[in-house]
Amino acid sequence: MLVTAYLFLLGLLALWGVLEFSACHSKPSASSNALGNPAFRQFQYDFYRTYFPALAADWLQGPYLYKLYQHYHFLEGQIAIIYVCGFGASVFAGLVSVPLTSRLGRRKSCILFCLLLSASYLCKLSQEYFVLMTGRVLGGFSSSLLFSCFEAWYTHEHAEQHDFPAEWLPHTFTRAAAWNGGIAIAAGITANVCAEWLGLGPASPSVLAVPLLVLSVVLVIREWDENYGQTSSFRRVCGDGLRCLLRDRRVLLLGTIQALFESVVYIFIFLWTPVLDPHNAPLGIAFSSFMAASAVGSSLYHLATSKKYHLQPMHVLCLSILMVFFSLFMLTFSTAPGQEHPTESLLAFLLIELACGLYFPAMRFLRRRLIPEKEQTGVLNWFRVPLNLLAGLGLLVLHDSDYQSGTRNMFSLCAVTMLLALLCVVSLFTMVRNDSELRLPASEPEPNGTE
């Protein structure tokens, strides 16, 4: 299992490199004006050197979070409750994060994110169940702030302070998304070195992340100016979002697809460690392999929707759901009690991550076309509620004391969930198949971005 994980990682990194090299040399740069502007390059660099340490700190916790709770001798059900608390915090944070950052200020919100995540990581040094639960709640809340506050600050400064053209924005976020994939891969390898090679234990990656957050805070305080968003009442934002959901069946179907798909992904995040860890898999390397597979999926999406192949995002969305269903079907057999096949399970997990790399840009495109910009915040808030509830209920109801049979049952239910998502996609496709608004024109490249 050890050698297999390393081979998968090396193969995926090589494939990602080939795809990115091909993409860079097969299309002319649309950002030549931006790249030729030294003021823009400096502004972009100043943003990246503050944003990337925060991203790295967020990723470092991923590989050994479940292992840490297991290391403290908590039962599977107790660990599930800790995760559910994190999901609950994410629901609440998703509802209040945008109004909060607008009222408090984006710069202060970035500092708040770093402080909350640092506190969350320091809580992991305790073996007290309540302290660990509190840390997970803080982590769930802070993660919802990460993308909203940093990217909102940059977008405002880009347009209002520096008066750069709006078409230069995708260039910054495309590069950020590419770097984010590389940072996640590096974070997994670094966590593996700390926890396993150096023998520092599963809490060490979280401790290592704190100095990165301190660096990010120092740079924000020293170099960033404050900016604010338009303040709207929480009731109005959610009310407008609910009305949009109810009046447009396409939006309702899209939200259902997102809730079903992403709740399965959340359950996968919980389950991959107890499936692979008993077979001595290097968890950090496995995590880096997942991130590499997701990066490959994102590159394949942009290749598939390019002028050469011209697949539509709706087709890619359907393909990603089919891939996840097939992977979950594999997992119901590879995790059968007494007949475990860890290599097949790892392969299935990699297919799920590959599908995620296809899914997120396709979903982002469809959301942008279907949901009016002024109502997106409210609609996305409503999307997040069933997403987190489904994931939380799945963990609480199905994960019984015998984790092996419980895990297999969870994968079976997740496969059924993906079938429901597939039915929703077919229904949505039938409804919009002649809608040119939801088709990607041959001349329009789909910009990448963080999700």
Curated annotation (Swiss-Prot):
It comes from the Eukaryota. The chain crosses the membrane at residues 1-21, 45-65, 79-99, 130-150, 180-200, 201-221, 251-271, 281-301, 316-336, 346-366, 378-398, 410-430. GO terms for molecular function: molybdate ion transmembrane transporter activity. InterPro entries: MFS_trans_sf, MOT2/MFSD5. It is a multi-pass membrane protein. Keywords: Cell membrane, Ion transport, Membrane, Transmembrane, Transmembrane helix, Transport. Its main location: membrane. It is found in: Cell membrane. CDD domains: MFS_MFSD5_like. GO terms for cellular component: plasma membrane. One of its GO terms (biological process) is monoatomic ion transport. Belongs to the major facilitator superfamily. Mediates high-affinity intracellular uptake of the rare oligo-element molybdenum. This is Molybdate-anion transporter. The gene is mfsd5.
